[in-house]
């Protein structure tokens, strides 16, 4: 069977209704993306962890429906638009989807990733490239964080250089758990990973089991009281600014904090918010993204 992708862009208020209608009318799958992704207009969908998101699509959304090539896309989209209550049928484009061995193709796109001095992120279908490597076995999945994104890489390099044996670590916005797992493999003591997304929490638990890393995961309400030697948060600049007081309060006096998910042009603004609580500066920049690192002052 051959397939095509039907791609339409439309405002946020119509994206979810159109997606539901497309599925009801026979689309094989539907996804919604930020049409402004990787541009200055890109918007985070979620706000502060622990809060229920106020919206379920982006201001400028791209709806992508996978359809049978034998199906008339114009008829399908017109029917879906009518079902969703749209005043008119949105313009669309079609993309051909080639027949593929999807498992083999996916595996071929994820080779081992070398990070820092000794870290290797290795998919389960690969062997460790070096006998003395610090190996994290991680497959692509639902949760963010496989080591390929510059922000994840920056945080991993920072942790490799920073974590000392027995230190306590909080990974806030843990995604796949990659940073928490790395901290444990670097010799940390108690490690906690927190994420707003229950699917991410479950994925992180599974990844930790696979890597034999004893890490405690939970939702924001599960975050333990007390302070940590190290806090790392790889999120986005706006949530980081909102959570500055809370995140820095989790750092022991003299403890370390690292923040990423921050574009280089956003670094000064984020740093100025955190400077009220910690001595902080850009630690390293990579491909337009930065990792900010700081130390909590003795008096908070």
Swiss-Prot record:
Its main location: cytoplasm. It holds the Pfam family PrmA. One of its GO terms (biological process) is methylation. GO terms for molecular function: protein-lysine N-methyltransferase activity. It is an enzyme of class 2 (transferase). Its EC number is 2.1.1.-. Keywords: Cytoplasm, Methyltransferase, S-adenosyl-L-methionine, Transferase. It is found in: Cytoplasm. One of its GO terms (cellular component) is cytosol. S-adenosyl-L-methionine binds at residues 152, 173, 195, 234. InterPro entries: Ribosomal_L11_MeTrfase_PrmA, Ribosomal_PrmA_MeTrfase, SAM-dependent_MTases_sf. It catalyses: L-lysyl-[protein] + 3 S-adenosyl-L-methionine = N(6),N(6),N(6)-trimethyl-L-lysyl-[protein] + 3 S-adenosyl-L-homocysteine + 3 H(+). Belongs to the methyltransferase superfamily. PrmA family. HAMAP family: Methyltr_PrmA (MF_00735). Methylates ribosomal protein L11. This is Ribosomal protein L11 methyltransferase. It comes from Burkholderia thailandensis (strain ATCC 700388 / DSM 13276 / CCUG 48851 / CIP 106301 / E264). The lineage of its organism: Bacteria, Pseudomonadati, Pseudomonadota, Betaproteobacteria, Burkholderiales. The gene is prmA.
